[in-house]
Every structure is written in C-alpha cells, then in structure tokens.
A protein has these predicted regions:
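Interdomain hinge/lid region at the active-site interface
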Residues: 74-151
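Composition-driven low-complexity repeats that form or flank extended alpha-helical/coiled-coil segments
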Residues: 142, 146-169
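Rossmann-fold dinucleotide-binding core
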Residues: 1-34
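Amphipathic alpha-helical blocks and their helix-capping loop/short-beta junctions
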Residues: 48-89
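Conserved Rossmann-fold dehydrogenase catalytic segment
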Residues: 31-53
Length: 169
C-alpha cells in the first residue's frame, strides 16, 4: 500500500495515557487514515469476520479450483470482470507470506464459530441449489439482500468503478 490515505487503523489502546495516544493517532490521521477505537476483544471479534472469513473464503476458492484441477489460466477465456477481480484477490493473497495468514487465522479464537456459520450458510445455499427449484434460492437471496440493503447502492457503485478499471486497462 503506497499510502495510509483511506486505510483503516484499529486502535486498541492499553497502557498508554490519553495525550500520548492522541499524539500517536494524529500521525495516522494527518496521513489520511481512518481511525477506529476498539477493545482488543471487539477487534478480534470483528477481524474474525473482516479478515478471517474473507481470507478463508479466498483460500477456499483456490483450494476448490486446485481440487477440481481447473487452473486459473484455463478459466481465462471464460472470465468475467467480476471473476477477474476474484482471481486477482486469490493471486494477491497467495503471493504473500503464508505465516502472516497462518497466524491471523489460527490465533483468533473468534474465527472457528465464524467458519462454522459459513459452513452452515454454504450448506443452506447448496441445498437450495440442489433442490432444482428457484424458490428456495430466491428466498435466501431476498433475505440476504434485505440484510445488506444499507450498502447495496454504494457497493454497486464501487464495484462498477473496479469493473470499469479492469476492462479499460
């Protein structure tokens, strides 16, 4: 990342006085970072979703393709811009230090229940698909769309920007 501008910094202050903390955080704020204060416990709970779930799903895509024997190169002629972005995320993660991700994923005590919920969600969606009827899938989709209603507009705009950048490069 070339700059802190727009990056998120989670501050979990412990054993630091308020003046020293304010001075430290002001360095990040001057560089354009967004600061969120959190307890260590809340940080780990949220990171179980923000990092743990996200990276686990990315690794699951890679593992699934490897098990199927479908290389990223073989999918090239079939890829859509969204798929290309997904493959970029997979490739980016796999090009990094595995120890960083091993520590991040294995040392967060809140991640196992998140992954259990993910497995249950995947099983629910799989059952809906395997039913051969569109109704169960539509029901899941509608519930999830309602839950995410607060971000769907901005998410569409942001991903439209990414897709446009992908197809114009």
């Amino acid at each position: 990342v070339p700059s802190l501008n727009g990056q998120t910094i989670i501050a979990t202050p412990a054993r630091i006085d308020e003046a020293a903390l304010a001075a430290l955080l002001s360095v990040f704020e001057r560089e354009g970072a967004r600061i969120t204060r959190s307890s260590p416990e809340e940080h780990d709970r949220m990171m179980a979703v923000v990092q743990g779930l996200t990276h686990s799903i990315t690794l699951t895509v890679a593992e699934t393709m490897r098990r199927l024997g479908v290389s990223p190169e073989a999918t090239g002629p079939y890829r859509s811009p969204v798929y290309q972005i997904e493959m970029g995320l997979v490739g980016r993660l796999l090009s990094q230090d595995p120890d960083l991700y091993a520590d991040m994923l294995t040392e967060n005590p809140y991640l196992p229940p998140v992954l259990a919920a993910c497995e249950a969600s995947f099983a629910h969606i799989r059952e809906a698909i395997e039913s051969g009827e569109p109704g169960p899938f539509r029901e899941i989709f509608a519930h999830d769309a309602e839950f995410f209603a607060g971000i769907t507009q901005s998410a569409s705009e942001e991903t439209d920007y990414l897709i446009t950048a992908m197809v114009q490069r």
